Every structure is written in C-alpha cells, then in structure tokens.
Amino acid sequence: MDRKQVSLMRATPPHLPAFSEALQKTWAAFAESDETLAGQFRQHRYHGNEEDRAAGVEWIGNRIRPTPGLDRVMVTNGTMNSILLLTSSLVGPGKVLLTEELTFPQVYTLAKIAAVEVQGVRIDQQGLLPDDFERKCKQHAPKAVYVNCTVHSPTAHVMPTERRRAITEIARKYGVQIIEDEAQALYLDNLPDSFATMAPDVTWFLMGLSKYLSLGIRMAFVVAPSERALVNILERLRPISTWHPAPLMASVITSWIRTGVAQTLLELARIELRKRQAIVSEVLSDIDGFQGSPGIHFWLPAPAGVDSEQFSRAIGEAGILVRPSKLYAGDREPRFHGIRPGVGDPVDLAETRYAVEVIRGIYKQLRDRMMIHCSD
C-alpha cells in the first residue's frame, strides 16, 4: 500500500477559507469602485506611497518603539529582495556579512549575487554567542550582521533581552549594522524588544507578509536607522524598479491593513497555528532538544549519531517531507543536526497529527538502532 505523503517542507502560514473570502470581497470592491485600476499600472510604486508606508508602520505595531516616522520606511516586493538590497548596499562586494551559523538558505544565494562573503557566528539556544560574535568582528571586520532571532529558522529559538543587549554593544563597538528580520514575531506574545527598539541607530528592520498571510504575497516593510540612511540607499537604487512593490499587490495589502482585514487574517492564523503546534508538542515534547513555537515551524534534533540528511531522508521514505539543517549551513557542515518541519501545509489538524506521529516513529527507530549499534 502506498504511504500517505505530507509535505512539511515549506515555512508557510496555514491556508484559511477567510483568506479566499477576503480576496473575493476585495476584487468585488475594486470592480464597484469609481476609480479605475488601470491608473495604478501607469507608474511605479517607488518604495511605496505614503499610504503604503503608513500601513507598514501600523502592521509593525509596537515591535518598534517609539513609532518610526514614514521618512524611515521603505516598501519592497518581499523580504528576500530587501535582504539583497541591504546586503549589496550596506556590505558591498568583497566585504563580509555575518549571520547565525544556521540561517535561511536563500541568504547564501543572495550574498553570492552581491559578491559578499558570509561568515557564520556560533549560536546556542539563545541565539548568537556574544564571544564568537566579537571574535568574528575582530577577525573579519564585517559591515553588517543578519539576524533572524525571533523564532529563528531553523532552530525556533527566541533571543532573550540580555543576549540582544550584549549583541547590540558589540555591534556598536565595531561599527556593524544589524539587519533584523522579524518574519514570525507577530505570532508570539510577550516578546523581547526588537533590535530596532533597543538600537535604532544601527538597525535595519525587516518585516515581510508572506509568513503571516500567504506565501505568494511579495511585499515587505523596511525601517531604516534614520531618514538620511534610507535616502542614501534610495538614491543608489532609484534607476532600478525590480524591487518596487507591485501596484495591485500594494493596493490590496494596504487596504487590508487599513481596514483591519489583514489583522483578522493574522489572528485566525495564530489560532490555527496554536492548535497545530499543541499537537506537535503533545507528540514530540519529551524528545531532548525539541523546540516548539507559536509560529509556522518547529525544531527537532536528530538522534545521536545521525546527521540531518540521514534523518530527513528516513522521514521522507516514510512519506513525510522535511528540511534538514544541512540546508541552513551553506557550504559548512552544521554543528547542529536536525530538521525544521513547517506546520502550515497539512490540510487539517488530523494530517498534522499523522505527520508528527510518523516523525516520532522514525526518530525512535533511528535512536534505537544507534543504541544497539553503540552497545555492540
């Protein structure tokens, strides 16, 4: 009998019927509007119009305090494009960008496009290790550090306040800009302050919408340290339109934020994800090193003696597709071997439970096999 296949590969919010309903209502509203949509396609939405940027500030909410002025805000067509723009502008060819030793695979690709060297900083369960961060600053004279430390991908950790303060002090000491990506922060309650709140003078804050609303929404908000810093980048990018938000996309998302539709969809996603992650924790939380979250993925270390690719391959052969930590290490061999399953793609709670129970079964098989092997 064929095994049921479930993909936990993507870090995506769950599909909600309310999202389709919101789109249908939006198209109907556009059709009934006295304003012609064609007018929106006659010119670029250069770094977002004032309404777009105001919507960005509203969406970011209290993740940045005090509230940033619109003159510090840029709207782009997605987080990855934003990272490319900042990497090429803040770091530059031949220079060094620091990241967590495990980070989004796309960051390595974007760095290659920008001819930037990536150096990984060691992490623990609280994120970047200050000692190693300072060591890398002395050794490589980096221009910037990219951090995804609020539900880190892949390990799902959240960097606590004291660690953020330590990283901030070192970044200021060595003149390193912080590129902070809060892809999942809005799923959590009682968060530490963002770097953009603690150290606005050295932080570039990113928040996209694809991890909150739907993977195909290519729109992100960037908050610069100052108006002057943003102007410097915009002057460099002005001749290029590939990073501008698409007019129709920007109109839809700005309208949704302004009317509260986006916030309602986010809250529905939060509720659904909490149900799914509760199942994950119920099935896996007794495994040493397991890290759940209220977000769209979790972390499960491989059994001792098993590398991440062996672990993910065995799970895949059982019909559940997951990403190994090797993908997040670039050209290096990862120090942490495990998997980063996403919980957004299963069709319902029952499929979520099925998938994580299969993962648990494979984990136990591999663990027991290694224990027998070690005892021989």
Residue ranges and their predicted role:
Residues 317, 333-376:
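PLP-dependent enzyme catalytic core of the Aspartate aminotransferase-like
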Residues 270-281, 289-302, 311-316:
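Conserved glycine-rich beta-strand-loop-beta hairpin in the small C-terminal domain of fold type I
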Residues 32, 37-174, 179, 185-204, ...:
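Conserved core of the PLP fold type I
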Residues 300-340, 350-354:
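Conserved C-terminal alpha-helix-loop-beta "cap" of PLP-dependent enzymes
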Residues 225-226, 258, 301-303, 344-346:
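Residue-level recognition of strand-loop junctions within catalytic nucleotide-signaling folds
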Residues 1-51, 317-320, 334:
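N-terminal "arm"/small-domain region of PLP-dependent enzymes with the aminotransferase-like
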Residues 201-270:
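Conserved core segment of the aminotransferase class I/II
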